[in-house]
Amino acid sequence: MGRSLMKGNEAMAAAAIAAGCKCFFGYPITPQNEIPEFMSKVMYESGGKFVQAESEVAAINMVYGAGGAGVRAMTSSSSPGIALKQEGISYLAGAEIPAVILNVMRGGPGLGSIQPAQSDYNMMTHGGGDGDYKCPVLAPANLQEAADMIMEAFDMADYYRTPVYVAADGFIGQMMEPVEIIYKPKYELKEKTWAANGTRGKREKNIVNSLYLEPELLYEHNIHLQEKYNKIKEKEARAENYYTDDADVILVSYGTMSRVVRGVVDTFRAEGKKVGMIRPQTLWPFPVKAFNNPNCKLYVSIEMSMGQMIDDIKLAIECKVPVKFFGKAGGLVPAAYEIIEHVREFAGGIL
């Protein structure tokens, strides 16, 4: 299949089907409505199942059921809808059920607006539900990467037995770009012998849940989860480093925002200013190793939120140099000229 001009939401939905998604459960909410609309037709054509659930809560619990039976299952929503799913996502993590959760983010808090934003960073990376759990969070910056990350998310979910987020936003969902959808398995996956998919008289029944009434057993389960998360942190964290080798000032941004910041870096470089960019491609695990930049004297987090990524940057650099923030929330996007003005102000005599 060659490259096709596609809308982001449809490209991500098509990528899910290419990766073998057999069950999609969703509920309408802007700006991701094209995804369930697309799935309602194409999922049946591909031999899968589509259900428009009665609520976001119902949808995530349907994912729990399908994933627990060993089927590749997915849901999509946007910020307030993802918030409603948090209990179910905690259950998925606790029961170690693979699932893909696509969040096409919009402005908040509350109902907020339907405009693009990045204000769900904390909810996704630091666990919005109860308990000590983590979910891998993949953050695409263009439609090709969005489609690729959707396909990768299914493999990652199966390999680690965990729910996986793909953190897009309204821009990624609504823009159109050329995309080529080719599914290439990333991991060597094993048969799901743990799944509750029927004994067929050949084995003992499997029980898939997150309930441990004995404190010692629950503690052991939590230790097991943390060991798994440590493996994910070691193997899966990644970022794009753009002109960071000699940079005095490094801007940090992800997703759609990084497209603007890349142009800002190019502007500074044209002036002979040593400015670079780190673009986290995984929000969790956060790409700590990408921040090993001994020349850097200042980091600036540029976000479509009110600074939710700053603390992770400070932890990554162990607060050795200053970290500043510039961003906008509620659906507004920092313009290149605004970023340039703030970086000059923050940098002072550094640049």
For each of these PLM feature ranges, what is it?
Residues 1-127, 134, 142, 329, ...:
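Thiamine diphosphate
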Residues 7-11, 227-249, 262:
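Glycine-/acidic-rich phosphate or pyrophosphate-binding loops and their flanking alpha/beta elements
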Residues 100-105, 138-140, 165-169, 302-303, ...:
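Short beta-strand segments
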Residues 115-165, 169:
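Conserved thiamine diphosphate
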Residues 161-241:
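Conformationally flexible catalytic loops at phosphate/diphosphate-handling active centers
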Residues 261-292:
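Generic long, charged, amphipathic alpha-helical segments
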Residues 304-351:
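Peripheral docking tails and interdomain loops at the edges
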